[in-house]
Amino acid sequence: MSFIAVAFINAMVDLGHKIIIQNTIFKIYDDQTQVALTAIVNGLILLPFIFLFSPAGYLSDRFSKPFIMKASAFSAIIITLLITLAYYQGWFLFAFFMTLILAIQSALYSPAKYGYIRQLGGERHLSAANGFIQATTIVAILGGIIVFTVLFEWLLIDQRYHDEASLLRHIAPAGWLLVILSIVEWRLACRLTDTNKSTDFLRFPWKNYINGHLLKTNVKNLYTNPVIWYSVLGLSFFWGISQTFLAVFPAFAKMVLAENNTMIIQGLLACSGIGIVVGSLLAGTGKHGLIKTSLIPLGAIGMS
């Protein structure tokens, strides 16, 4: 249960700060500026997972999975304290930049999380465990959207603001919720047991990573397994379309629907996560740990 709680809180903390920044952008900016800034926020969250998947995977193999999760959880405490400081000082650009730092922390944590699932459940229960942890993550995201959006609007009741700085100062107490959640996550991560020891013999090829050769090699390796390659392509299309919609819809709702309440906007966007929860649980119902590859084209049809 500690592992599930760690995954839940980690997703909620990542989403919580993003929601606050997105809602701030929604309240202050309009039209193309709002769409562009929202797209940048989404990009800052996704890019670390692309550029850091090689070193993140190395760290997950080099050190024990619980150690990586403990270190990531502790770093989240420091990051959320800095974010809270930015809220109180009204440092919008700094808080905006901390979105990237928080995403880097999550990108380094992610391989250890999924590797730990395999250690706990083994090959036989891998499919069901992956589906359950994915559903847990999405539920955390939905919960984070509701909690932080409601808190955001509540802190702005009867408050006046004219720019990002004044708005952030009003909602600054929300930062302490991020800090508290990070502390709880770290305490729970400290309870995780080491099932595998560190491996001292692994060395990361930094030179190949910097010049891009390692990335090319990893991408080429995807071609060796068509199922993995097509799954990666499908996920790329899904998240590409999803992030485009998430960036455009708030501006559309504000301009066309004349809706300025972020609880309604974020609530509508949160509905998209319900389908992901159902799909994750459905994908985890394979017998004997087998992954239902037949669901991949079904998912593609549903997306189209």
Regions found by a protein language model. Name each.
Residues 77-84, 179-186, 304:
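Small-residue-rich packing faces within the transmembrane alpha-helices of Major Facilitator Superfamily
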Residues 58, 88-92, 153, 157-161, ...:
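Transmembrane helix-loop junctions in multipass membrane proteins, especially transporters and channels
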Residues 2-19, 41-60, 64-77, 94-153, ...:
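Substrate-agnostic recognition of the 12-TM MFS/MFS-like secondary transporter fold
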Residues 20-29, 84-86, 141-178, 251, ...:
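Transmembrane alpha-helix termini and helix-breaking/packing motifs in multi-pass membrane transporters
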